[in-house]
From Swiss-Prot:
The keyword Ribosomal protein applies. This is Large ribosomal subunit protein eL19. GO terms for biological process: translation. It comes from the Eukaryota. Ribosomal protein that binds calmodulin. Belongs to the eukaryotic ribosomal protein eL19 family. The gene is rpl19. It comes from Dictyostelium discoideum. It holds the Pfam family Ribosomal_L19e_C. The lineage of its organism: Eukaryota, Amoebozoa, Evosea, Eumycetozoa, Dictyostelia. Gene3D superfamilies: 1.10.1200.240, 1.10.1650.10.
């Protein structure tokens, strides 16, 4: 058997592919063996004695199917897991995700003037202290605290109005009694 290493290398260079993809016609080995220059190899390529093999298809259809099933929750059971829960998804990463969501929301609310800077700081520190499990609980807390503040303000206003009313009544009574004393002394 004649060595066709040189011809294969030259053909690979000309065809711009790897040596593994170069096909040499087994019936024309004698002619191919005689080709010892690039021009001769080009001639053999033109005649069809040397060809470039097509790329071997490595289908991803099975992998795609498997990934689609995984998205539906298949192949995720205890038997398919390697590594502890912490190794698979560290609690620190979960914390970072959660705190970033909460802080982004607080910042947005502060910029939209939904909360003032004092409540922002208070809620920021509460979020840092792991008070809020998720975004929804934080929003609920904000709404609840706002309604509570409004209620307290309303109660304070009513109490102040009551105090003012009582004071005015007291003043009127005092003025009346003072007027009576003046009349009785005359």
């Amino acid at each position: 058997m004649v060595s066709l290493k040189l011809q294969k290398r030259l053909a690979a260079s000309i065809l711009k592919c790897g040596k593994g993809r170069v096909w040499i016609d087994p019936n024309e080995i004698a002619d191919v063996a005689m080709a010892n220059s690039r021009d001769n190899v080009r001639r053999l390529i033109a005649t069809g004695f040397i060809m470039r093999k097509p790329v071997v298809v490595h289908s991803r259809s099975r992998a795609r199917e498997h990934n689609a099933a995984k998205r539906l929750g298949r192949h995720r059971g205890a038997g398919n897991r390697l590594g502890t829960r912490e190794a698979r998804l560290p609690s620190k990463i979960l914390w970072i995700r959660r705190i970033r969501v909460l802080r982004r929301l607080l910042k947005k609310y502060r910029e939209a003037k939904k909360i003032d800077k004092h409540s922002y700081r208070e809620l920021y520190l509460k979020a840092k202290g792991n008070v809020f499990k998720n975004k929804r609980t934080l929003i609920e807390y904000i709404v609840k605290s706002k309604t509570e503040k409004l209620r307290e303000k309303l109660i304070q206003d009513q109490a102040q109005a009551r105090r003012n009313k009582n004071k005015s009544i007291k003043d009127r009574r005092a003025a009346k009694s003072a007027a009576k004393e003046i009349v009785s002394s005359n």
